[in-house]
């Protein structure tokens, strides 16, 4: 089905605190990923691939890079005369605003009231996955649910608060717990929901009138028994970015061909802002293996098991292993990096050695010189 009757809402700053190293200067949605993407590209592309033609991006702070990346939405075919892409920034300047999902939704209530769509898909930007939103919306409508909660089966992230679900044979949620971590075989929410627009507006208005602030605690958990809450099992590959370690592991997972094939599906492409650069240059002494190297790079040294973004230069004699080098990074001669994440425009000078671990990668701030 084509979802012209569905509104998409993206929360670009939700979970910023889990990735503080990278979100100090940008929203979580604009965190670089996989050599050429930003985290918001995945849920935004999922919406577009499902035919959702009106998407609101809810922002809180540090959203300049997000606006630069998305622009008018042209790369996602959302630069339209009618509907298309909407940025929804804070409307006030008090510290109490937008400190949770309910406050964010309360702040965009005029936008919701003026939208003609009947259903709303709400998604956080910490989900890396190519999910069929078409099927998700169809299941929501067919079940007659008040809220559909997308979940994965497996071990939930131990470093964030998870919504753990128990469901009946028909998918209806019979019990719910909110806690950090959880058993190895859990049904845990991934921050993706479908609701009727009117139901969402009523729930938010009620929560605000009672000074409730948590969507999960006050709209979901409080109403397990008196609302029709249904679970939807996401079978596609999904990685939840909740910490620097999980960010590192999610990037490294792209070096696995099976993961790439699940994430980048030809019938449901992941769109991003196009930057026209020359292909990467590989010198006579370059050695590159099991790595993703974006265009515009200049590789003269050794790169193994790494994610290399655009315009990265690795000088002769330098060795880069198990690293994520973001745009504009320069690794000078005879330096050795292992399990290192460099933010944009970092310079690693000659003969430097930096060594982290996959469970604790070394992070270098944007523009730093080491």
Model-derived segments and spans:
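Unchanged
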Residues: 1-253, 364
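Left-handed beta-helix
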Residues: 1-12, 198, 206-370
């Amino acid at each position: 089905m084509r979802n012209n009757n569905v509104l998409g809402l993206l929360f670009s700053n939700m979970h910023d605190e889990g990735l503080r190293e990278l979100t100090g200067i940008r929203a979580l949605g604009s965190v670089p990923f996989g050599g050429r993407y930003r985290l918001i590209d995945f849920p935004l592309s999922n919406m577009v691939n499902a035919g959702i033609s009106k998407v609101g991006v809810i922002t809180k702070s540090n959203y300049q890079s997000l606006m630069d990346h998305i622009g008018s939405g042209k790369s996602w075919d959302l630069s339209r005369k009618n509907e298309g892409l909407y940025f929804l920034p804070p409307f006030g300047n008090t510290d109490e605003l937008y400190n949770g999902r309910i406050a964010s939704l309360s702040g965009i209530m005029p936008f919701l009231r003026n939208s003609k769509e009947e259903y709303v898909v709400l998604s956080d930007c910490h989900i890396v996955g190519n999910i069929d939103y078409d099927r998700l919306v169809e299941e929501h409508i067919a079940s007659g649910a008040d809220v559909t909660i997308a979940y994965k089966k497996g071990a939930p992230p131990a470093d964030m608060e998870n919504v753990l679900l128990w469901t009946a044979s028909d998918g209806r949620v019979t019990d719910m717990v909110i806690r950090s971590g959880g058993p190895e075989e859990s049904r845990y929410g991934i921050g993706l929901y479908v609701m009727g627009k009117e139901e969402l507006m009523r729930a938010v208005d009620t929560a605000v009138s009672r000074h409730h602030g948590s969507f999960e605690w006050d709209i979901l958990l409080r109403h397990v028994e008196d609302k029709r809450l249904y679970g939807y099992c996401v079978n596609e590959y999904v990685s939840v970015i909740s910490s620097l370690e999980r960010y590192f592991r999610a990037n490294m997972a792209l070096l696995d061909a099976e993961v790439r094939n699940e994430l980048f599906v030809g019938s449901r492409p992941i769109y991003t802002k196009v930057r026209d650069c020359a292909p990467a240059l590989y010198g006579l002494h370059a050695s590159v293996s099991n790595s993703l190297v974006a265009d515009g790079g200049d590789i003269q040294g050794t790169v193994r098991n790494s994610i290399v973004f655009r315009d990265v230069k690795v000088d002769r004699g330098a060795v880069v292993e198990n690293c994520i080098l973001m745009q504009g990074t320069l690794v000078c001669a005879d330096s050795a990096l292992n399990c290192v994440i460099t933010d944009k425009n970092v310079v690693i000078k000659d003969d430097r050695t930096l060594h982290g671990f996959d469970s604790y990668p070394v992070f270098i701030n944007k523009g730093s010189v080491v």
